[in-house]
Amino acid sequence: MTNIRKTHPLIKIINHSFIDLPTPSNISSWWNFGSLLGLCLIIQIMTGLFLSMHYTSDTTTAFSSVTHICRDVNYGWLIRYLHANGASMFFICLFLHVGRGMYYGSYTFMETWNIGVLLLFTIMATAFMGYVLPWGQMSFWGATVITNLLSAIPYIGTTLVEWIWGGFSVDKATLTRFFAFHFILPFIITALVIVHLLFLHETGSNNPTGLNSDADKIPFHPYYTIKDLLGVFILILSLMTLVLFFPDLLGDPDNYTPANPLNTPPHIKPEWYFLFAYAILRSIPNKLGGVLALILSILILALLPFLHTSKQRSLIFRPITQTLYWMLVANLLVLTWIGGQPVEHPFIIIGQLASISYFSIILILMPISGIIEDKLLKWSL
């Protein structure tokens, strides 16, 4: 009798993707984040679905409906905080996943990498629109400030902003369309994830050495299913600790005040996972320049395959670029800190220096160090 797992048209696809998938035998725990991101996406879609059953996308009732979810709906508080903190976990896993890709040279899989960059943009857009929905002070002013950036686009800017708003300010029409987009985008993300995996399985996974591992492959199940399960337990433990003990740790207290267009909060800032990009945006005095720098801070990832100058794929045997990589990580942490600070001395200059070094490390220093390391390797032989 033939095995249904290997013959059934549908089950066969799942089998080749998660069970009999040939996987390098030496991939470390840094390769766990793909499955953790899948889990985060499932958690977000499920909690979001239940929240949408009780939420109303109307400016007069949105804030009250969120309060109603927390107070009156069975385990509504749990669903709400799982969704809010689940987004933070999603971004932690995302940043680690992208960081792993940069360190081990996974960006040489061009199609997989570019779909990944597109996914990052889509997830960021989804998270931004989700932050607007509770209709607190930071929701309203965050939406106003960020959408207003589009007015920097020459000629069509103002028209574009009013078109997105559905009026002359952020109001009922804006909230309704943001809710519609926030609901549909996770399903588009799911489709993109499938394409991301499709391209990945065309080439097979990268590994810490960056070398071809065709000669040493093992089946994904049971080896990596068990390994991924450890990551799943750690993720769930971290998320539940956050939700049950510190649910508001990563949120903004201003968002517990209903949106008021007549009262501007003293410091308008986005969620913590956007602070690095927000710091880059603020570090440029010109509005259009700031917007371009903001977009480029993420889009720069798509340039990585073209900036790769070394003969080696991974950074595992490249000490100079390794040092630059960790400088970049530290730099991003500084940018995240600066993004949450008020626009005053010394934070302005620190933000500008950190922004310059962010682009310098990726665009100039890393490609140069790749060439230097190749030369050193040639001389040492």
From Swiss-Prot:
GO MF entries: metal ion binding; ubiquinol-cytochrome-c reductase activity
Q: Which BP terms in the Gene Ontology apply to this protein?
A: mitochondrial electron transport, ubiquinol to cytochrome c
Protein name per UniProt = Cytochrome b
Q: What is the cofactor note?
A: Binds 2 heme b groups non-covalently.
What's its job?
Component of the ubiquinol-cytochrome c reductase complex (complex III or cytochrome b-c1 complex) that is part of the mitochondrial respiratory chain. The b-c1 complex mediates electron transfer from ubiquinol to cytochrome c. Contributes to the generation of a proton gradient across the mitochondrial membrane that is then used for ATP synthesis.
**Gene Ontology CC: one annotated term:** respiratory chain complex III
Q: What cofactor is this protein dependent on?
A: heme b
> Which sites bind heme b b562?
83, 182
Q: Where does heme b b566 bind?
A: 97, 196
Subunit structure as annotated in this protein's UniProt entry: The cytochrome bc1 complex contains 11 subunits: 3 respiratory subunits (MT-CYB, CYC1 and UQCRFS1), 2 core proteins (UQCRC1 and UQCRC2) and 6 low-molecular weight proteins (UQCRH/QCR6, UQCRB/QCR7, UQCRQ/QCR8, UQCR10/QCR9, UQCR11/QCR10 and a cleavage product of UQCRFS1). This cytochrome bc1 complex then forms a dimer.
Q: Provide the leader sequence positions.
A: none
Q: What InterPro entries is this protein classified in? A: Cyt_b/b6_C (IPR005798), Cyt_b/b6_C_sf (IPR036150), Cyt_b/b6_N (IPR005797), Cytb/b6-like_sf (IPR027387), Cytochrome_b (IPR030689), Cytochrome_b_C_euk/bac (IPR048260), Cytochrome_b_N_euk/bac (IPR048259), Di-haem_cyt_TM (IPR016174)
TM region positions: 33-53, 77-98, 113-133, 178-198, 226-246, 288-308, 320-340, 347-367
Query: Which positions does UniProt annotate for a ubiquinone binding?
Result: 201
Pfam families (alphabetical): Cytochrom_B_C (PF00032), Cytochrome_B (PF00033)
Q: Lineage of this protein's species?
A: Eukaryota, Metazoa, Chordata, Craniata, Vertebrata
Q: How does it sit in the membrane?
A: Multi-pass membrane protein
Q: Which family does it belong to?
A: Belongs to the cytochrome b family.
Q: Where in the cell is it found?
A: Mitochondrion inner membrane
Q: What else is known?
A: Heme 1 (or BL or b562) is low-potential and absorbs at about 562 nm, and heme 2 (or BH or b566) is high-potential and absorbs at about 566 nm.
Keywords noted in UniProt: Electron transport, Heme, Iron, Membrane, Metal-binding, Mitochondrion, Mitochondrion inner membrane, Respiratory chain, Transmembrane, Transmembrane helix, Transport, Ubiquinone
- Species the sequence originates in: Archboldomys luzonensis (Mount Isarog shrew mouse)
